[in-house]
Amino acid sequence: MTKEIQLSICIATHNRSIFLKEAISSFIPQLNDEIEIIVVDGASTDDTKLIVENFSTINNSIKYLYLNEKGGIDKDYDIALQNANGKFCWLFSDDDICKPGILDLLLKLIKQDLYSLILVNAELYNFNLDTKFKNTALNFDSDRVYDIDKQSQVNFFEDCTDYLSFIGCVVIDKKLWLSRNREKYYGTEFIHVGVIFQEFLPKKVYIISNPFIRIRLNNAQWVKRSISLWILNWPKLVWSFLNFNSNSKTKIIAKESLSQYRRLLYFRAIGLFNAKFHKEVKDLTNPSFPVNLISYIISILNIKLCNLFYRFYAKILNKPWMSIELKKYS
């Protein structure tokens, strides 16, 4: 008798076959008949199809869906979940890998039928996954459970929203996902955050504190457009959630996009923040006078000096992955 699929590992990808191969390989030894992998390919032109089909000949629980056009990360993940058979779906990144033991743990938690959402902690690694930068992305000493009462959900929002900007940590009830407005968040690149926080969750949230994901840093495809994501999309999204007050939202991100001075300095240091972009954001957000003035000054600072300053700052903060990224633009 065929067992019901409990967990679908959903991966949206585009032209990153070499990393996708590593990601899928990390799951293969842990797969059983209660788990499937769904790969949604946003019109890749590399050998993604061949690689996934080779895996599927070894294990028929690996499924491949090719899209005629790239819909963007939000839409492509949504398509993956719509085609998934599992009770829960893990929105896994195509360039990271999982560690042994996580799938058995997730199955155990899913079968308890207590949770709407499970978050998996991660380690931070370099591009080649051979040097660890940080032991845990989410600094929890032990597993946590957030209940369904309002204060618990507010605590979850304040404690975990920053980490939730990483889509690969999310394991979510598929019925919950499909019941919520998703199209609203297409183009934000944070659809999962919108789905989770647009309303309070009906069941508890479980945080796995042990890091079972290895995140490959300095490999994001969206570096050039990241300034729009972090300066415009992210604050707009966080401040759109009606169930959380201003104090809670401010703990995540300031409402005024141009008041993110450290982030603006970073983007100036890599040459993405300039007077033209400043004007675009100013026209969209109407910042206060001091915020407008300070952010404008940042937009015209010497890029090389900003880069040097921020590399020193990253060294003080012990963030070597940031230094590596900055060196590319020095």
Name each region found by the language model.
Residues G194-F197, L201, I207-S330:
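C-terminal subregions of glycosyltransferases and related glycan-biosynthesis enzymes
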Residues M1-N233:
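Nucleotide-sugar donor-binding/catalytic module of glycosyltransferases
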